């Protein structure tokens, strides 16, 4: 949760001058529909829950298992897109979803045999996937009337506040984790948030949210490779 908090605080810190000093974005934020702003705030809270549970899951299970299960987000996005936004899902997409479900079940069964602690991590990862799906679906709706910059700023702002509140509730201090934690937070802000989540948010206006979520399915393989070399996880 410390890493996620630093990541979002860095993001808000870097984006605030853009919003404040850019007349177009400033006017858009001031004139934004209050209902959409509230939705964006809710989206930010769910994003904070996603980060909190995903990072917590890594304490209980492997990077590969956690990332693979988090990627079941595509299932919940597809179902939500179909049920709540009247979207259409192709046969190939449903096939991909089925394969994702089977893969996740295999991981869960393997972790169940490995011990209850691993299964706890899997449950946290699954909850993180559901929260990420809600964040994505709200983004699809909000992006119809907002630019990427203003939408993501509101979401990240409320996400950062939510993470700070969670940090206070947990009793953990905000400081004292060394310069490495600050640097990692900055790097995650630059590459995972501004060049990751923000690009996905941009795409939500032009592409199906199910497709956006499916594009993240390469994460487990990449994460597994890094985990093998950095943490000797197999």
Please tell me what each predicted stretch does:
Residues 38-60, 80, 106, 123-138, ...:
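Hydrophobic alpha-helical transmembrane segments of multi-pass membrane transport proteins
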Residues 17-42:
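Membrane-helix interface linkers and caps
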Residues 1, 12-15, 77-78, 97, ...:
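Transmembrane alpha-helical segments that form core, pore/gating elements
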Residues 67-70, 83-106, 118-122, 178-179, ...:
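Loop-to-transmembrane alpha-helix entry segments
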Residues 1, 62-63, 88-89, 147-148, ...:
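A helix-boundary/kink motif common to multi-pass secondary transporters
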Residues 15, 41, 80, 89-111, ...:
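Hydrophobic transmembrane alpha-helices of multi-pass small-molecule transport proteins
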Residues 9-14, 69-83, 98-99, 158-162, ...:
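Alpha-helical transmembrane segments of compact multi-pass small-molecule transporters, enriched
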Residues 3, 7, 57, 69, ...:
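Hydrophobic/aromatic residues within transmembrane alpha-helices
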């Amino acid at each position: 949760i410390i890493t996620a908090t630093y990541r979002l605080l860095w993001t808000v810190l870097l984006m605030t001058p853009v919003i404040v000093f850019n007349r177009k974005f400033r006017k858009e934020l001031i004139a934004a529909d209050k209902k959409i702003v509230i939705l964006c705030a809710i989206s930010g809270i769910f994003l904070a829950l996603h980060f909190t549970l995903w990072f917590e899951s890594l304490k209980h299970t492997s990077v590969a298992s956690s990332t693979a299960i988090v990627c079941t987000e595509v299932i919940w996005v597809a179902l939500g897109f179909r049920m709540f936004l009247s979207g259409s899902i192709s046969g190939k997409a449903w096939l991909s979803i089925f394969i994702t479900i089977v893969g996740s079940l295999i991981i869960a069964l393997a972790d169940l045999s490995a011990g209850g602690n691993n299964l706890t991590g899997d449950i946290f990862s699954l909850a993180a996937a559901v929260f990420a799906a809600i964040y994505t679906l709200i983004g699809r709706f909000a992006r119809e009337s907002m630019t990427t910059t203003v939408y993501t700023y509101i979401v990240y702002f409320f996400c950062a506040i939510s993470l700070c509140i969670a940090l206070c509730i947990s009793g953990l201090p905000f400081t004292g984790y060394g310069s490495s934690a600050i640097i990692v937070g900055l790097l995650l802000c630059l590459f995972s948030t501004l060049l990751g989540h923000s690009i996905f948010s941009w795409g939500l206006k032009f592409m199906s949210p199910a497709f956006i979520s499916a594009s993240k399915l390469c994460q487990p393989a990449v994460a597994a490779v890094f985990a093998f070399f950095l943490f000797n996880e197999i």
